[in-house]
């Protein structure tokens, strides 16, 4: 099995990258892909860059160049569920765009023409992630993760997301684009991220302060998930 792992920012991939043995680097289209073994498992780790376009382009390059069997999207996210705090884990059962609106033509809010309203995460990957969470005794929430090309830092943006997606547990800027690409390539995916901030008016300050905490937690989860998947 080869596992593809995607993070947007240097801070979100550096801890994992440093653990990859026999590491080789592919630089293409503004993305970097690091291949090798993580705990004896073949992996391809992508640093995509921030935002939906960068994430989609990077995911496509990763799938074409390295042909992983599954994709794990990792990194940080803003918490929307009331039970979440910095360092907690969110696991996707579905991903949707929060900034797409073609409702004038009868589509659901967040749905693009020719696409499902939401992209479902692979049930086996979700179950494996939840098994790791239990083993590590982490606080976690499973549910809808929404993505858009905006850092949500204020009551107006937050209110809009909560109005359109009251069930959403977290918000970030890449996961749904990655899920979209995986859907088109028919490759199973799951989003496993750690909370760096709770989406409110001070979220930019929290993000800067706690990104390192989120990176450590998400790295811990991904390492354990990779080993879990390799064991079958």
UniProtKB/Swiss-Prot annotation:
Pfam families: PNP_UDP_1. GO terms for biological process: L-methionine salvage from methylthioadenosine; L-methionine salvage from S-adenosylmethionine; purine deoxyribonucleoside catabolic process. InterPro entries: MTA_SAH_Nsdase (IPR010049), Nucleoside_phosphorylase_d (IPR000845), Nucleoside_phosphorylase_sf (IPR035994). GO terms for molecular function: adenosylhomocysteine nucleosidase activity; methylthioadenosine nucleosidase activity. Keywords: Amino-acid biosynthesis, Hydrolase, Methionine biosynthesis. The keyword Hydrolase applies. It catalyses: S-adenosyl-L-homocysteine + H2O = S-(5-deoxy-D-ribos-5-yl)-L-homocysteine + adenine; S-methyl-5'-thioadenosine + H2O = 5-(methylsulfanyl)-D-ribose + adenine; 5'-deoxyadenosine + H2O = 5-deoxy-D-ribose + adenine. Its EC number is 3.2.2.9. Substrate binds at residues 78, 152, 173-174. NCBIfam families: MTA_SAH-Nsdase, PRK05584.1. Homodimer. This is 5'-methylthioadenosine/S-adenosylhomocysteine nucleosidase. It comes from Klebsiella pneumoniae subsp. pneumoniae (strain ATCC 700721 / MGH 78578). The gene is mtnN.
